[in-house]
Amino acid sequence: MKVRVSIKPICDKCKIIKRHGKIRVICENPKHKQVQG
């Protein structure tokens, strides 16, 4: 899980979702998980 100021999808399978007011990237690849913070 990476905490970044600006998040962007890394690959085609990355999806941007909003959960509890936080923007996240979820992906099949665990290395691509990101949260904005």
Swiss-Prot record:
Q: Which domain of life is it from?
A: Bacteria
Q: Which GO terms describe its biological process?
A: translation
Q: Name one GO molecular function term.
A: structural constituent of ribosome
What keywords are assigned to this protein?
Answer: Ribonucleoprotein, Ribosomal protein
Q: Which InterPro entries match?
A: Ribosomal_bL36, Ribosomal_bL36_sp
Q: Which family does it belong to?
A: Belongs to the bacterial ribosomal protein bL36 family.
PANTHER family recorded:
50S RIBOSOMAL PROTEIN L36, CHLOROPLASTIC, LARGE RIBOSOMAL SUBUNIT PROTEIN BL36C
- Protein name as annotated: Large ribosomal subunit protein bL36
List the source organism.
Fusobacterium nucleatum subsp. nucleatum (strain ATCC 25586 / DSM 15643 / BCRC 10681 / CIP 101130 / JCM 8532 / KCTC 2640 / LMG 13131 / VPI 4355)
Organism classification = Bacteria, Fusobacteriati, Fusobacteriota, Fusobacteriia, Fusobacteriales
